[in-house]
Amino acid sequence: MTKKHIWRIKRIYFDQLKSGKKTLEIRVGYPQIKKAQKGDIISFKNYGFNEFDVKDVRIYQTIAEMLDTEGVEKVLPGLTHGAALHTLQRIYPKDREKLGVYVLELIFKTNRFRPKKYKRA
């Protein structure tokens, strides 16, 4: 059964996901993250009506392993491997990284049927 998840995200990463420049969202294994599965829908708070389909979920032991496998451009476009590793380790220190590194492959959904409060006049 498809579930809808509502999460927070920084504006720069939201814009990259929506434009398709960034296709992978990285999180660690907090309980709410572990619930996300292929086929679910993710929406991000504070950016209006937006939905992303979860195309796939992959799990890694470390951030470095994830970057080596997935590639930097899909995760943090425009950064070098070293800069991406540093950025993600600042967001997720070792104690959080130990929860598992979750990679969510997301695709922005074009919504033909938006709620009335979001419809244009």
Residue ranges and their predicted role:
Residues 1-36:
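Compositionally biased, charged N-terminal/linker segments
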Residues 3-5, 15, 99-109, 116-121:
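Ribonuclease/tRNase effector modules and their secretory precursors
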Residues 29-31, 46-51:
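Short, charged beta-turn/beta-strand-edge "cap" motif at the junction between a beta-strand
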Residues 50-59:
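Short beta-strand-centered aromatic/proline hotspots
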Residues 58-75:
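Short, solvent-exposed secondary-structure boundary/capping segments
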Residues 71-114:
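Glycine- and charge-enriched low-complexity intrinsically disordered segments
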